[in-house]
Regions:
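Anion-binding alpha/beta catalytic cores of soluble intermediary-metabolism enzymes, centered on
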Residues: 1-196
């Protein structure tokens, strides 16, 4: 049912943005990267002007943005700049059409190599992200159930597969729990099974 609704163009206005030069579909180049960048910018301007009510994006080819001299790690950072939101976060949300159950996933880091993730994570960052996730979730449920995934497989297996959970993540979550005793917070849970 939802696939039909999404594919039905009735009531949808398609806004075309001209290209500065021709691009070949399926052939990545700087012109295509620039077009992608300009389209995102124009889409945000349309929403900000009230001509559109929402913005949905797809993944972009960051290498092509860079080829066109647009030096952003990703579109999240460009969206943050355009909207004056320096502390923006990337959040994915889904709701089951059958049960109404909602899953909201907020990322602690974005657009960095996996090897760099441990150096970017710390207790203060995780607590700030939990504050953002709580504020978002409370828009739909005044008493949300929050879960934090561990960084390592099996949430570190008590230090056998990594120490981040035991050296700082557990303490950060305990401190956040003390500040928010009304919130049900679980974690760090094994990231390989916390989605089940």
């Amino acid at each position: 049912r939802s696939a039909t609704a999404l594919s039905d163009p009735a009531g949808l206005e398609m806004v075309d943005q001209p290209l500065s030069e021709a691009v070949q579909p399926g052939q990545g180049n700087a012109a295509g990267g620039d077009a992608s960048f300009q389209w995102l910018t124009a889409a945000v301007e349309l929403v900000q002007a009230g001509r559109c009510h929402s913005l949905v994006t797809a993944p972009i080819a960051k290498s092509l943005w860079h080829a066109a001299n647009h030096r952003y790690p990703g579109q999240t950072e460009r969206l943050a700049e355009l909207t004056g939101s320096p502390n923006a976060s990337m959040l994915f949300t889904a709701r089951s059409p059958q049960s109404g159950w909602r899953l909201n996933t907020l990322l602690a880091t974005t657009h960095i190599p996996l090897a760099a993730v441990p150096q970017h994570l710390n207790g203060a960052l995780v607590q700030r992200k939990l504050d953002k996730l709580l504020a978002f979730c409370q828009r739909f449920n005044p008493a949300p159930h929050l879960v934090v995934a561990g960084l390592n497989p099996h949430a570190g297996e008590a230090g056998r597969l990594g120490a981040e959970e035991s050296t700082w993540l557990e303490a950060a979550l305990d401190a956040w729990r003390r500040q928010h005793p009304e919130v049900q917070l679980e974690g760090p849970l094994p990231p390989d099974t916390c989605w089940l």
